[in-house]
């Protein structure tokens, strides 16, 4: 049985912040969808291109997942140590016919806690940022490829301050291609800052900064009461995870005997036609791949849109599928 603190699990995983999180107060939510719109496809391609300048990559599928205002699990006694602290972060999986990349995004002030109580042994354990293929083999099973890039307070706290793709808060990993024969390959582009500590962007590189749509599987707007206020403009959101190694170095600690290539299958979700929402609403969410709004919909006329692992809820602006 897997629980945080025992990474890697026996199943395949992509973990931008693996920890016991709590949504019972109704404020934290998880949103996910596959988006094939040209705008989202282009934005994902540009993030990958920024991290891997030598690669020509044009995704055919992009899956976007947002964890918004997640609270830490406080243990059986409801510990108040992390009371009021919330984490918001994103994972984007971009795939073509020959390769796959994971993009992790961490906004300013997006990570406010770094450890949680474990629901298994009631001890505090640090979150983990990593990847695993899970068990493999037939008669004799063993751990497949797995890589851990952050698993202590210092490296996790640095996720929103550093980068391996040259843009603060953005971390890019190649997770499926011939190049990953010995494991996940992280990007290796230094984060340049000027004398004032601000991000420095290459003059000849124009990263797409338009507000792109992030929605749940039902393609409805994010509930109006949920977004946390106080986040900066979305194009300043990308501040990325700091692995346990220095950002200027390759991860020498990846175990070569246990890391093997794996390709992430991308599951198809129901498609909608997103429209970009008002910028003011985007600025409240603090995410890069922002939310979209469509025509008014209700649970009653969209009975089969939600996953079997989600429940449908109606809001004033439409319905959404909430993970359970």
UniProtKB/Swiss-Prot annotation:
Protein name, per record: Nidogen-1
Residues that span the membrane, as ranges: none
GO terms for biological process, alphabetical: cell-matrix adhesion; extracellular matrix organization; glomerular basement membrane development; positive regulation of cell-substrate adhesion
Subcellular compartments: Secreted, Extracellular space, Extracellular matrix, Basement membrane
Glycosylation (residues): 97
Keywords, comma-separated and alphabetical: Basement membrane, Cell adhesion, Disulfide bond, EGF-like domain, Extracellular matrix, Glycoprotein, Secreted, Sulfation
Purpose: Sulfated glycoprotein widely distributed in basement membranes and tightly associated with laminin. Also binds to collagen IV and perlecan. It probably has a role in cell-extracellular matrix interactions.
GO molecular function: collagen binding; extracellular matrix binding; laminin binding; laminin-1 binding; proteoglycan binding
Region (Disordered): 219-259
Record text on subunit structure and interactions: Interacts with FBLN1. Interacts with LGALS3BP. Interacts with PLXDC1. Interacts with SVEP1.
Species per Swiss-Prot/TrEMBL record: Rattus norvegicus (Rat)
Bias-annotated ranges (Basic and acidic residues): 247-259
Gene: Nid1
SMART domains: NIDO
Post-translational modification comment from the UniProt entry: N- and O-glycosylated.
One Pfam assignment: NIDO
Domain EGF-like: residue ranges: 295-324
Residues with Sulfotyrosine modification: 200, 205
GO cellular component: basement membrane; cell periphery; extracellular matrix; extracellular region
Chief location of this protein within or outside the cell: secreted
Residue ranges occupied by any NIDO domain in the UniProt entry: 16-178
């Amino acid at each position: 049985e897997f629980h945080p603190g025992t990474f890697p699990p026996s199943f395949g995983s992509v973990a931008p912040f693996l920890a016991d999180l709590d949504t019972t107060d109704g404020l934290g939510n998880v949103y996910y969808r596959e988006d094939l719109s040209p705008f989202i496809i282009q934005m994902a391609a540009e993030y990958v291109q920024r991290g891997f300048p030598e690669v020509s990559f044009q995704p055919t599928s992009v899956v976007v997942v947002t964890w918004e205002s997640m609270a830490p699990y406080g243990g059986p006694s409801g510990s108040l140590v992390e009371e009021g602290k919330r984490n918001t972060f994103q994972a984007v999986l971009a795939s073509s016919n020959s390769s796959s990349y994971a993009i992790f995004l961490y906004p300013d002030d997006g990570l406010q806690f770094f450890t949680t109580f474990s629901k298994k042994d009631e001890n505090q354990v640090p979150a983990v940022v990593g990847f695993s293929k899970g068990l493999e083999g037939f008669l004799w099973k063993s751990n497949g490829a797995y890589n851990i890039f952050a698993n202590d307070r210092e490296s996790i706290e640095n996720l929103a301050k550093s980068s391996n793709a040259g843009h603060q808060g953005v971390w890019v990993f190649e997770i499926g291609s011939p190049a990953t024969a010995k494991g996940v390959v992280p990007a290796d582009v230094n984060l340049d800052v000027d004398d004032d500590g601000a991000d420095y962007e290459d003059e000849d590189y124009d990263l797409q900064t338009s507000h792109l749509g992030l929605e749940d599987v039902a393609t409805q707007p994010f509930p109006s009461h949920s977004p946390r206020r106080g986040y900066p403009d979305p194009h300043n959101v990308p501040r990325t995870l700091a692995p346990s190694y220095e950002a200027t170095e390759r991860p020498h600690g990846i175990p070569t005997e246990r890391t093997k290539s794996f390709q992430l299958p991308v599951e198809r979700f129901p498609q909608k036609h997103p429209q970009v929402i008002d910028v003011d609403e985007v600025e409240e969410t603090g995410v890069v791949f922002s939310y979209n709004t469509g025509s008014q919909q209700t649970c009653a006329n969209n009975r089969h849109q939600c996953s079997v692992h989600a429940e449908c809820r109606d809001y004033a602006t439409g319905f959404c599928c909430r993970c359970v």
